[in-house]
Each structure stands twice: as structure tokens, then as C-alpha cells.
Amino acid sequence: RDEELLQKIILRVKELRHMHNHQSQEQLAEATELGIAQLESGKNFPNLTTISIICKFYNITLDEFFAPLHYPPKEK
């Protein structure tokens, strides 16, 4: 498990919820049928299908989801 990547994904999901009228975990979970609380607590590492469902819900592309993550960091 890549904990750094997981934390970046968790922060991105939280950011999207807050950008869209401060939706609760429950609202997103109900709309997507996903375990958002478990994802945001780091208990579940999301797969690409899970992230794709979140992207469809927020009407964004996978590129738009991952663009602000800047991962993996460039070697110096």
C-alpha cells in the first residue's frame, strides 16, 4: 500500500465534497453506493473503478481528479 498516494486521494475526495456544497460523506455514499467514510479514514484503498464512480458523480474526468495530486513526485 502506498500511504502517500492514499492520503492524496483522501484529500482530493474531501476537496471535491467541499467544492460541491460541502456534501457529507453520507450524501456522497448514498449517491454513489460507495463506502466513503471507510475510504476517507484510510481503511479502504480505492481502486480505479471507485475513483471513476466518484468522477462520474462530480462530472469530472480522471485526469481532472488526479491532476492536482502531483504524484509520484519527480526525482531530484
Segments predicted by a language model, with ranges:
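A short, Lys/Arg-rich alpha-helix, primarily the initiator
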Residues: 1-20
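DNA major-groove recognition helix of helix-turn-helix/homeodomain DNA-binding modules
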Residues: 49-64
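Short alpha-helical DNA-recognition segment
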Residues: 21-38
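Short, charged recognition helix plus adjacent turn
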Residues: 3-4, 56, 66-76
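Helix-turn-helix DNA-binding elements, focusing on the entry/boundary residues of the two helices
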Residues: 13, 24-25, 48-51
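Short, conserved catalytic or interaction motifs in soluble domains
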Residues: 41
